[in-house]
């Protein structure tokens, strides 16, 4: 028996040629009806021999359990393996007569030939795309490599690779179950096999899918592309495709004629993208999709707005008129960044469909996670857990798709439970150039689409000058997404007829490419000639179609001349019906009190300190935390975590969906939140008590994110776009790390309303505080947020009745640094109770989470209470303000350091401390009151951050404005520095003591000039 166990390795000697380089599908031992066949991987990893062992041991048990060809193969091989051996042959091996030797040799040859053919088929399935004719210009291989895989039969002599000869070309071979090239036939000649493989894998479509580790999915793709005759189109479908190409090309031609010197980033060279997108939408609509959310860069955007979203042409043409005055607030944006929302009938399916094109900046690919977040939210509000009603399409450029890291971050959100959108169709406009950069200098991978392999997304490369191939690929892509709820990539290999923009000269850097482009016949003419030649349309019908669309454009151009005002709100990508009045203004300019009834506080506190599920064992450390919450609730106090719990819980009671996302937010970076409880005895059994507060509450979502800031913050921003009736929060692990999402903050959050008239109520929770933890765990960079705040430091405001709310409405975002749990509770609730939405930036504490003094009473949170923009001094100094020698203004955690130091120096009557809770927009009215309350006091601003950071540069000119420059505001804090904080604990404490000494040295500023 030991000899038998060695036999597979001896068999491998005979089969080595067939197994050495490829995965070889199983030959004919399972019927087509029995499901996908087994396969075994390359022998380099040992998988080939493992498979052969399985087959061999199955044969040992029962020779009839394997195909007869394997039976013959093993019989012959076992005889050879034991030839010359003194040991007896195994009883399971039947002796054959000498006359059968010739038959055995023929059988062995037959098996080897069939295995060779299967290897050949698999070679085309894996590597055929390398030699596909993808470049419309015929210059480059799309994979940047002219190497032709040795196992593809590009010439007759390549047959020798498989030990086949030219004489074998007309032999019939049994087809394996891993191919559909035979259609209804089970055998084909080798010549026909190669021809069909060439037609499927090496023409205008290149398929990358064999890396997918799911046999069913691979079989699905093979069937869609290999089955003979699958790419057949009716005359009506061809005419529709031609009409869409006409619209795509003539739109660009019209803009070029009317505004030849304007930048528009036209689609010339990839006009087929318009029918491609429309096909994806048509097919998806047919399968039940009702809402499609698109994201794309500038290239071809106006064409998509006109011919896919169906924006009124006159409104597009108005964007080219420099004399029109913008009617809406804000600064606006260039025309090729604008978004759009439109509900219409899909004429192909006669079904309603909503199309949204999300506005985006010039920062390529930044819109990707935003689109995904908006899509996820729309699915959530519709109860569309499987993504059968709402989907997303992302259009990319080849250079950006390969070069921008946010693409990778977004892909890795695609299958996370709280972030999946159940599949996205990605369309890459691969014009084989990035501005002036050659692809060889722009990426290290063969294709720009290789990043999609990380999520097992199939990649369909297609020559954009073959419109029918493009349309078929897009139809399959839509079906794939609907069938498997996974991402798919369509790579439109095309060219860029003009420079990067219409004013750019590409011949400087790509002379040979552009010489070929100038000779290139436009795809519309190519396809029209084809249809005319085959009789699908006549020349007259084609010319009439062109004239018809030209007339539509001219008429719209005429109407655009009558426009007097440019309305940015016509380009809103995420309207909130019913939230604003008909003019898009808030329905009021007031905000109700944010406190809640005490019985609600008590109820939420009770749930927060318990486990709603039976037989659920929690960690003993967590039990102590819950007991602590119960004690606080009993004593009518809250700490930071409990205040947050009560804010969230009360909003859920009011029907407001709350979503908290970020790294480690379920537990909390500082182990303070614990919104998800884990059973200590049952793996993966969890409980979210917040979802057990009320029978009819809104759902609460708390989800740990991937270790990404850029992608995840963009996702949450998009999520917040979908509805104003949700509190969407993103928490950084430490505030320092938000700068890896700086693009989202700069291009979307701080400027989104000004550019795109888009309100957004996203909340950023940024842990911040100087505690000796080093330069990367200390600062959320408040100075940067304040620098981007748009309130005027030099304008003395008019203190009207609605000043507080009007000031919030006029700002671009709200920046706060709360020093009490109660104020944190109120600012979260105010975010929803305001009659409009603004981004909210909160610098949250770390050490204050457990600080014994950082607690609030229920009295500060009950009905009738509200957020305090400024918390004034309420101690001895406030009772005798005329005796106060110094009034210190501060914000955040440093307040507790100041109070402790003041107490140690017994200066409660001489030094008053006022906390600035809302930093921007600046509370001019309350600061004025506080300063006037202490007329004889020096004014000082104290911060724990370095002087060139923190808040001083922001507050100083505003103090000067409100005080009419009558009194200086002195600086107390750390000296200027390059790094936000020291990494040395001792240095931290020394610098802390130094500025605290200055704060309470009442002679510190004598003799100094401001």
From Swiss-Prot:
PANTHER family, per the entry: 2-OXOGLUTARATE DEHYDROGENASE, 2-OXOGLUTARATE DEHYDROGENASE-LIKE, MITOCHONDRIAL
Protein name, UniProt field: 2-oxoglutarate dehydrogenase-like, mitochondrial
Transit peptide limits: 1-73
Places the protein is found: Mitochondrion matrix
Entry EC no(s): 1.2.4.2
Complex and partners: The OGDHC complex comprises multiple copies of three catalytic enzyme components, the 2-oxoglutarate dehydrogenase (OGDH/E1), the dihydrolipoamide dehydrogenase (DLST/E2) and the dihydrolipoamide dehydrogenase (DLD/E3). OGDHL/E1-like isoenzyme may replace OGDH in the OGDHC complex in the brain. The presence of either ODGH/E1 or ODGHL/E1-like isoenzyme in the complex may depend on its tissular distribution.
SMART domains: Transket_pyr
Source species: Homo sapiens
CDD domains: TPP_E1_OGDC_like
Residues that coordinate or bind Mg(2+): 398, 431, 433
Highest rank taxon of the organism: Eukaryota
Protein's GO biological process: 2-oxoglutarate metabolic process; glycolytic process; tricarboxylic acid cycle
NCBIfam families documented for this protein: 2oxo_dh_E1, PRK09404.1, PRK12270.1
Principal location: mitochondrion
């Amino acid at each position: 028996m030991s000899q038998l166990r060695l036999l597979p390795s001896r068999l491998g000697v005979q089969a080595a040629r067939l197994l050495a380089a490829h995965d070889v599908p199983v030959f004919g031992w399972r019927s087509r009806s029995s499901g996908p066949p087994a396969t075994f991987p390359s022998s380099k990893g040992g998988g080939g021999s493992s498979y052969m062992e399985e087959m061999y041991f199955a044969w040992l048990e029962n020779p009839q359990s394997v195909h007869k060809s394997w039976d013959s193969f093993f019989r012959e091989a076992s005889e050879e393996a034991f030839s010359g051996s003194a040991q007896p042959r195994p009883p399971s091996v039947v002796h054959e007569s000498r006359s059968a030797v010739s038959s055995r040799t023929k059988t062995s040859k037959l098996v080897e030939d069939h295995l060779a053919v299967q290897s050949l088929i698999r070679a085309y399935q894996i590597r055929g795309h390398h030699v596909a004719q993808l470049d419309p210009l015929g210059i480059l291989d799309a994979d940047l490599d002219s190497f032709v895989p040795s196992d593809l039969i590009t010439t007759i002599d390549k047959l020798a690779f498989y030990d086949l000869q030219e004489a074998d070309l007309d032999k019939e071979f049994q087809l394996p179950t891993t191919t559909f090239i035979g259609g209804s036939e089970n055998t084909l000649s080798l010549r026909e096999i190669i021809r069909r493989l060439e037609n499927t894998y090496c023409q205008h479509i290149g398929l990358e899918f064999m890396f997918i580790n799911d046999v069913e999915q691979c079989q699905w793709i093979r069937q869609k592309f290999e089955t003979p005759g699958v790419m057949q189109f009716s005359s009506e479908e061809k005419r529709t495709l031609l009409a869409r190409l006409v619209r795509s090309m003539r739109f660009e031609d019209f803009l070029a004629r009317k505004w030849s010197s304007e930048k528009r980033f036209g689609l010339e060279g990839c006009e087929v993208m318009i029918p491609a997108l429309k096909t994806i939408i048509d097919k998806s609509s047919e399968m039940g999709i009702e809402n499609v959310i698109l994201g794309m860069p500038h290239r071809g955007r106006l064409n998509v707005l006109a011919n896919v979203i169906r924006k009124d042409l006159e409104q597009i043409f108005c964007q080219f008129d420099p004399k029109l005055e913008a009617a809406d607030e804000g600064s606006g944006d260039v025309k090729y960044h604008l978004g759009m929302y439109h509900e219409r009938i899909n004429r192909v399916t006669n079904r309603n469909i909503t199309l949204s094109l999300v506005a985006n900046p010039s920062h390529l690919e930044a819109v990707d996670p935003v689109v995904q977040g908006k899509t996820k939210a729309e699915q959530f509000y519709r109860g569309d857990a499987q993504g059968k009603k709402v989907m997303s399409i992302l259009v990319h450029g080849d250079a950006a798709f390969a070069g921008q890291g946010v693409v990778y971050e977004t892909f890795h959100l695609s299958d996370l439970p709280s972030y999946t959108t159940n599949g996205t169709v990605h369309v890459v406009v691969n014009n084989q150039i990035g501005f002036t950069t050659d692809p060889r200098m722009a990426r290290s991978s063969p294709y720009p689409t290789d990043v999609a392999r990380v999520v097992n997304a199939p990649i369909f490369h297609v020559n954009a000058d073959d419109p029918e191939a493009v349309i078929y690929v897009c139809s399959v892509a839509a079906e794939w997404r609907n069938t498997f709820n996974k991402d798919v990539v369509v790579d439109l290999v095309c060219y860029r007829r003009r420079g990067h923009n219409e004013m750019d000269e590409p011949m400087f850097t790509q002379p040979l490419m552009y010489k070929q482009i100038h000779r290139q016949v436009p795809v519309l003419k190519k396809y029209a000639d084809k249809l005319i030649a085959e009789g699908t349309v006549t020349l007259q019908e084609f010319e009439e179609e062109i004239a018809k669309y030209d007339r539509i454009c001219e008429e719209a151009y005429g109407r655009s001349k009558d426009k007097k005002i440019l309305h940015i709100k016509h380009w809103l990508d995420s309207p909130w019906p019913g939230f604003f009045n008909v003019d898009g203004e808030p329905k009021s300019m007031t905000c109700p009190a944010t406190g809640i009834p005490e019985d609600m506080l008590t109820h939420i506190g009770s749930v927060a300190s318990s486990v709603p599920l039976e037989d659920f064992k929690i960690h003993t450390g967590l039990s102590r935390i819950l007991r602590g919450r119960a004690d606080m609730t009993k004593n009518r106090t809250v700490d930071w975590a409990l205040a947050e719990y009560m804010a969230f819980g009360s909003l859920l009671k009011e029907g407001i969906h709350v979503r908290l996302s970020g790294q480690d937010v379920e537990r909390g970076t500082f182990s303070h939140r614990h919104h998800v409880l884990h059973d200590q005895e049952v793996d993966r059994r969890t409980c979210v008590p917040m979802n057990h507060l009320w029978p009819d509450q809104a759902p609460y979502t708390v989800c740990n994110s991937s270790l990404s800031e850029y992608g995840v913050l963009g996702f949450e921003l998009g999520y917040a776009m979908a509805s104003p009736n949700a509190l969407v929060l993103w928490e950084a692990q430490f505030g320092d790390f938000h700068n890896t999402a700086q693009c989202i903050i700069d291009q979307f959050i701080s400027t989104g309303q000004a550019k795109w008239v888009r309100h957004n109520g996203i909340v950023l929770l940024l842990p911040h505080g100087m505690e000796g933890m080093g330069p990367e765990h200390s600062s959320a960079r408040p100075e940067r947020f304040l620098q981007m705040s748009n309130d005027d430091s030099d304008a003395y405001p008019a203190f009207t009745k609605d000043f507080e709310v009007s000031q919030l409405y006029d700002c671009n975002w709200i920046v706060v640094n709360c020093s009490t749990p109660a104020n944190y509770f109120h600012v979260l609730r105010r975010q929803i109770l305001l009659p409009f939405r603004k981004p909210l930036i909160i610098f949250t504490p770390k050490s204050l989470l457990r600080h014994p003094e950082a607690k609030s009473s229920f009295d500060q949170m009950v009905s009738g209470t509200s957020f305090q923009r400024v918390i004034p001094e309420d101690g001895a100094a406030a009772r005798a303000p005329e005796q106060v020698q110094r009034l210190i203004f501060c914000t955040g955690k440093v307040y507790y350091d100041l109070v402790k130091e003041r107490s140690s120096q017994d200066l409660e009557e001489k030094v008053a401390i006022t906390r600035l809770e809302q930093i921007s927009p600046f509370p001019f009215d309350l600061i004025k009151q506080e300063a006037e309350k202490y007329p004889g006091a020096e004014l000082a601003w104290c911060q724990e951050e370095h002087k060139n950071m923190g808040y001083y540069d922001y507050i100083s000119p505003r103090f000067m404005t409100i005080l009419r420059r009558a009194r200086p505001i002195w600086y107390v804090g750390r000296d200027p520095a390059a790094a936000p904080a020291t990494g040395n604990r001792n240095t931290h404490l020394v610098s802390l003591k130094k500025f605290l000494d200055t704060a309470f040295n009442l002679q510190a500023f004598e003799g100094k000039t401001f």
